[in-house]
């Protein structure tokens, strides 16, 4: 389905940006209400990463920001791009499918077994990142069981002419060129960003090339806006394959698949608008996303060349009613989501490899509402919401053959309460129900007879926590538990996915910040996660009480910032990831993956409008891997080794 943007744009301009007056604009933020507003409260227990924190950190990609500053668990991306697989609350290999990534409130997580295209988001275009752990299904639907990550880009509305250009060179023939431009007047703003990245990466046959461009044109004032945004990226990556246990000792950097590659091109266009009419705010988002990917694999059993085309159109109207009765502030959000997703896969094969001629469609229609109440006198915040969603999935596979279709009617709800306790302390509790729909890769069938499409995954979520905010210091603690039925999981013996018996995810999350002196600041995070099978069997093995693979029980991070001089700053990040089960070890018969600690540093110095920086990743040259898979007899494993010590130099000019 294609939407003609021209008449729609005219309608939005008339509705949202008519009769604009020249005014001084408030700071615009985006919150989990799916509205932009002036200084609206953050969601209960949300973590916010600001643009200044990103600029001062040792992170150079969005994935590194989420891992180093946000405490989000990530693993190596097999194709060598910065699109790190993410996992918020212990889902292991399916962490990506349970963590929803948004840009300006619009979904960019894929309906396939691929990571969200984080590499297409320029760091210098980000205003802030909101990480909300726990279910986000009420507002966003499927795939948000463990939480949402909302990346909010800068608005150029009212911004003076400004920009930046930067160059970074480093190990493995790294070349990274970036540029950004902003200009605006009282009622308009334009932002443009571009990047060109080239690197050979650590492994043989692992070169990665990335070109991105994005921008936004916005018209509006404090009572409304209309914005037309676009992003496009072109990725070309070589695929080295995994290393065996013996090869990790003898040839870590070698390639098992010297001919394999993955190329991908995608575009995203969106038209967004809001208009405030007294106590009501009307909003409408229309977005279109397309992707074309080519992937070649060559093995001893044959080769495959897969060509896939994906397209998704979304429409999201909503209304926010903000009013006050006595000392109670009400924020009632009512909205609808409609999306239409299409997929085509044409795979040619030789030898014993399987060819594939596959297509699929998914149509989602949802209605949701959420009411946020703030009782100012007692310092109490209450959030209550629900969602009803209808999903129609169809999947056609010509070679098996298979024609499958399913309809699902799904519900989600959430109740959250936060209470101010005085002296900077607050406590909160949250309970909710979420769901996830299996994507087309998870529903794929390789050999007849094919089963029906997988059942939706459902989760009952509970969380309690406390926060303290003082002068120059803060601390937070939370405990969560998720009881999941029909968790969607890969089953290696049949090369397919199944619905697991009941699982439980529970954990403790701690975070703290301290301004030690005027020039020294510390931030620390610790997470203990336990993901286990509550009952049932897997491949004929009783797995009751066993650990879910690829979920480290202990993770910790420490960020140190030292303003050595007014123009010189040192940033240090230390990340610890504890032991975890190898992929494919649901019976827990093999030893655990080794724990690892990685230290990254960045020294930055400002000279006028210039910033020069030296960065070193994996400072102590640790040998480690973040992904490994055990063989079928539980006697050995394969893994993807991570980069050892590497460095870069960068120069940035701002005007």
Task: Pin down the residues of each PLM region.
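Transmembrane beta-barrel wall of Gram-negative outer-membrane proteins
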Residues: 162, 169-198, 203-240, 260-278, ...
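Membrane-embedded beta-barrel scaffold of Gram-negative outer-membrane proteins
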Residues: 282-297, 340-342, 420, 426-432, ...
């Amino acid at each position: 389905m294609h939407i003609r943007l021209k008449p729609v744009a005219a309608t939005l301009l008339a509705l949202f940006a008519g009769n604009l007056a020249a005014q001084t604009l408030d700071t615009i933020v985006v919150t989990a209400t799916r509205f932009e507003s002036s200084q609206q409260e953050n969601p209960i227990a949300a973590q916010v990463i600001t643009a200044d924190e990103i600029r001062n950190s040792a992170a150079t990609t969005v994935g590194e920001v989420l891992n180093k500053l946000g405490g989000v668990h990530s693993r190596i991306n097999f194709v060598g791009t910065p699109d790190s697989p993410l996992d918020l609350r212990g889902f292991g290999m399916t962490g990506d499918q349970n963590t929803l990534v948004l840009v300006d409130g619009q979904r960019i997580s894929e309906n396939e077994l691929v990571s969200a295209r984080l590499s297409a988001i320029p760091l210098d275009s980000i205003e802030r990142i909101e990480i909300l752990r726990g279910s986000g299904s009420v507002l966003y639907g499927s795939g948000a069981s463990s939480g949402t990550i909302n990346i909010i880009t800068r608005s150029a509305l009212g911004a003076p002419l400004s920009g930046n250009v930067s160059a970074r060179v480093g190990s493995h023939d790294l070349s990274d060129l970036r540029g950004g431009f902003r200009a605006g007047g009282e009622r308009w703003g334009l932002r443009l960003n571009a990047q060109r990245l080239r690197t050979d990466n650590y492994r043989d046959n692992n070169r990665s090339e990335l070109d991105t461009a994005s921008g936004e044109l916005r018209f509006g004032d404090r009572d409304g806006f209309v914005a037309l945004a676009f992003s496009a990226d072109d990725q070309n990556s070589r695929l080295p394959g995994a290393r065996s246990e013996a090869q990790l000792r003898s040839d870590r950097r070698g390639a098992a698949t010297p001919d394999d590659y993955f190329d991908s091109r995608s575009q995203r266009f969106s038209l967004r608008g809001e208009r405030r009419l007294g106590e009501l705010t009307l909003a409408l988002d229309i977005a279109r996303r397309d992707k074309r990917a080519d992937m070649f694999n060559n093995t001893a059993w044959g080769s495959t060349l897969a060509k896939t085309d994906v397209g998704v159109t979304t429409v999201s109207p909503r209304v926010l009613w903000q009013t006050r009765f006595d000392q109670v502030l009400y924020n009632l959000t009512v909205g609808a989501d409609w999306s239409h997703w299409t997929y085509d896969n044409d795979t040619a094969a030789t030898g014993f490899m399987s060819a594939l001629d596959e297509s699929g469609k998914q149509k989602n229609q949802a209605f949701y509402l959420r009411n946020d109440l703030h009782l100012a006198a007692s310092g109490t915040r209450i959030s209550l919401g629900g969602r009803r969603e209808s999903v129609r999935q169809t999947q056609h596979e010509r070679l098996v053959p298979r024609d499958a279709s399913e309809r699902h009617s799904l519900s989600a709800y959430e109740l959250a309460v936060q209470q101010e306790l005085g002296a900077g302390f607050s406590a909160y509790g949250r309970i909710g129900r979420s769901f996830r729909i299996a994507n087309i890769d998870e529903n794929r069938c390789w050999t007849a007879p094919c089963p029906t499409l997988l059942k939706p995954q459902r989760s009952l979520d509970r969380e309690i926590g406390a926060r303290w905010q003082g002068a120059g210091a803060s601390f937070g603690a939370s405990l969560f538990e998720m009881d999941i039925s029909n968790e969607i999981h890969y089953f290696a013996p049949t090369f397919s996915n199944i619905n697991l018996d009941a699982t439980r995810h529970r954990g403790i999350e701690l975070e703290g910040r301290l301004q030690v002196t005027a020039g020294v600041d510390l931030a620390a995070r610790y997470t203990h996660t336990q993901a286990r099978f509550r009952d049932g069997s897997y491949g004929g093995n009783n797995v009751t009480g066993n650990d879910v693979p690829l979920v480290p029980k202990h993770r910790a991070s420490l960020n140190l910032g030292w303003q050595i001089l007014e123009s010189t700053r040192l940033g240090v990040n230390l990340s610890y990831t504890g032991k975890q089960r190898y992929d494919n070890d649901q019976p827990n018969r093999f030893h655990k993956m080794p724990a690892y600690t990685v230290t990254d540093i960045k020294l930055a110095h400002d000279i006028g409008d210039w910033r020069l920086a030296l960065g070193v990743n994996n400072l102590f040259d640790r040998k480690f891997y973040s992904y490994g898979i055990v063989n079928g007899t539980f006697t050995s494993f394969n893994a993807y080794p991570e980069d050892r010590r590497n460095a870069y130099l960068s120069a940035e000019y701002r005007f």
